[in-house]
């Protein structure tokens, strides 16, 4: 059974899918509605209000919401859909933590190396603001709460929605596209949208969603996506901050670069060059084959003897 077929191990009534999606994804839905119907001045006022909060308190408030939501998603899967969390995580007999670690180290290594090269070549738009006590608290908050934040996003978009939409439409490409677009829309209230532009940031968010979705389908599990997402977000919190980003933190550096000029380096380069290279690295390491079938193949219900619904 492939990753999407894991949904057959549980109850799949449509009302269960709708109820779980609405209840768990409510925070993302409200974010999008707020962005859609708010005046630009209201958005700016909301961002300015949050900037006045202590940075670590702001981070705790933003990330703390994901803790109960991830737990609630697990409860709905376990007791409403009556299937295991393992089936939501991977098609393997057990979670492969080495895969999580590898993708985590891959994105961290790339980010730190490229940042170091850029800093060595031109540091004029970066302010070194390291404060040991503030950074120690930031590090503690980040390593505790970011796993819940990225966990909810991965288990919801690449996990729950990918599996259940795939079972509904009987293919793989449609849930890959839909969950990637929804992943982008879920971030539409981020302040980066106002600083850089809606469509520019959608290229990045949807492109990142596609990367994580391709990882999940090709590898039959969330492990690589979980590691990548965690490494990316941790470094976004700890390494560099800026006045216009969603994460206002006591990071090691602060960027003063004009965000409107970041189309090439921050959006097109990662999506069109870096992401494909990372997929090739993972494909080589894990022996991915049959790309067409894994990304565009049909979904069929397995024989009953291949699985059982948890009572």
Description of each model-found segment:
Residues 19-32, 65, 106, 110, ...:
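Hydrophobic alpha-helical membrane-insertion segments
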Residues 1-84, 251-311:
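N-terminal, membrane-interfacial amphipathic/helix-forming hydrophobic leader that caps
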Residues 46-56, 60, 85-152, 162, ...:
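Juxtamembrane helix-loop-helix connectors linking adjacent transmembrane helices
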Residues 12-20, 54, 58-62, 66, ...:
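Residue-level signature of transmembrane alpha-helical entry/exit and packing/kink sites
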Residues 65-76, 104-115, 177-181:
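Hydrophobic alpha-helical transmembrane segments of multi-pass integral membrane proteins
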């Amino acid at each position: 059974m492939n990753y999407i077929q894991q949904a057959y191990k549980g109850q799949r009534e449509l009302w269960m899918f709708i109820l779980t999606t609405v209840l768990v994804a409510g925070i993302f839905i409200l974010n999008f509605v707020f962005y859609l119907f708010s005046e630009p001045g209201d958005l700016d006022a909301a961002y300015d209000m949050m900037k006045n909060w202590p940075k670590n308190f702001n981070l705790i408030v933003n990330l703390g919401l994901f803790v109960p939501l991830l737990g609630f998603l697990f409860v709905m899967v376990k007791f409403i859909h009556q299937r295991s969390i393992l089936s939501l995580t991977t098609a393997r007999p057990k979670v492969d933590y080495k895969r999580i670690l590898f993708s985590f180290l891959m994105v961290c290594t790339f980010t730190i190396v490229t940042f170091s090269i850029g800093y060595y070549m031109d540091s004029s738009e970066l302010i070194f603001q390291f404060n040991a006590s503030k950074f120690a608290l930031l590090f503690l908050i980040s390593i505790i709460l970011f796993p819940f934040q990225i966990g909810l996003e991965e288990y919801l978009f690449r996990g729950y929605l990918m599996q259940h939409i795939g079972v509904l439409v009987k293919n793989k490409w449609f849930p890959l596209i839909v969950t990637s677009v929804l992943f982008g829309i879920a971030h539409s209230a981020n302040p980066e949208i106002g600083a850089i532009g809606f469509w520019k940031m959608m290229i990045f968010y949807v492109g990142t969603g596609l990367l994580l979705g391709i990882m999940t389908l090709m590898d039959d599990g969330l492990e690589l996506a979980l590691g990548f997402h965690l490494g990316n977000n941790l470094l976004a919190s700890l390494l560099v901050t800026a006045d216009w980003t969603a994460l206002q933190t006591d990071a090691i550096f602060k960027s003063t670069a004009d965000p409107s000029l970041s189309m090439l380096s921050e959006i097109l380069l990662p999506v069109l060059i870096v992401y494909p290279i990372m997929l090739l690295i993972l494909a080589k390491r894990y022996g991915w084959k049959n790309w067409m079938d894994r990304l565009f193949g049909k979904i069929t219900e397995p024989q009953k003897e291949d699985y059982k619904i948890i009572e």
